[in-house]
């Protein structure tokens, strides 16, 4: 990954990713109390985005299949958004065999990876 690469802020504001929300709330409190400058809080959040993205890229090894009814889809600024109703997730590699999880609705946000955005092939040589 290049030194100037930017990372998406998906995990900060999601109401389902509590660690990002808790981090943002804690940093806001520290800024309000005058314990840290806003610039430091921004650096912490940027590192959080980078670390979480890298962790998901390297650490997730399970395969998941999603079935459901595609309700809405859109493409804006190279970011795809899909809303799927009545999704069924079949997760392989979870314990012995596979596990099925269902829900009422999910939102999937898909972006180009750093390599794809730079025009490189995934898995190719890196500088």
Curated annotation (Swiss-Prot):
* Gene Ontology biological-process annotations: positive regulation of transcription initiation by RNA polymerase II; RNA polymerase II preinitiation complex assembly
Subunit details for this protein? TFIIA is a heterodimer composed of the large TOA1 and the small TOA2 subunits.
Q: What does this protein do?
A: TFIIA is a component of the transcription machinery of RNA polymerase II and plays an important role in transcriptional activation. TFIIA in a complex with tbp mediates transcriptional activity.
Which family does this protein fall into? Belongs to the TFIIA subunit 2 family.
Output the InterPro entries linked to this UniProt entry. Answer: TFIIA_a-hlx, TFIIA_b-brl, TFIIA_gsu, TFIIA_gsu_C, TFIIA_gsu_N
- Cellular localisation: Nucleus
Q: What is the lineage of its organism?
A: Eukaryota, Fungi, Dikarya, Basidiomycota, Agaricomycotina
Q: Which UniProt keywords apply?
A: Nucleus, Transcription, Transcription regulation
Gene Ontology terms, MF aspect: RNA polymerase II core promoter sequence-specific DNA binding; TBP-class protein binding
The terms describing its cellular component in GO are: transcription factor TFIIA complex
Q: What protein name does the entry list?
A: Transcription initiation factor IIA subunit 2
Give the superkingdom in one word: Eukaryota
Q: Which residues form a coiled coil?
A: none
Q: Which organism is it from?
A: Cryptococcus neoformans var. neoformans serotype D (strain B-3501A) (Filobasidiella neoformans)
């Amino acid at each position: 990954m290049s030194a100037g690469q930017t990372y998406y802020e998906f995990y900060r504001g999601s109401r389902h990713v509590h660690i990002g929300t808790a981090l943002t709330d804690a940093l806001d409190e520290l800024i309000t109390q005058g314990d840290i400058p806003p610039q430091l809080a921004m650096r912490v959040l940027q590192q959080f985005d980078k670390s979480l993205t890298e962790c998901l890229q390297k650490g997730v090894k399970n395969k998941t299949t999603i079935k459901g009814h595609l309700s809405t889809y859109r493409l804006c600024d190279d970011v795809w958004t899909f809303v799927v109703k009545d999704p069924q997730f079949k997760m392989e590699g979870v314990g012995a065999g596979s596990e099925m999880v269902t829900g009422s609705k999910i939102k999937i946000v898909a972006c180009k990876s750093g390599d794809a955005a730079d025009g490189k092939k995934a898995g190719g040589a890196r500088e």
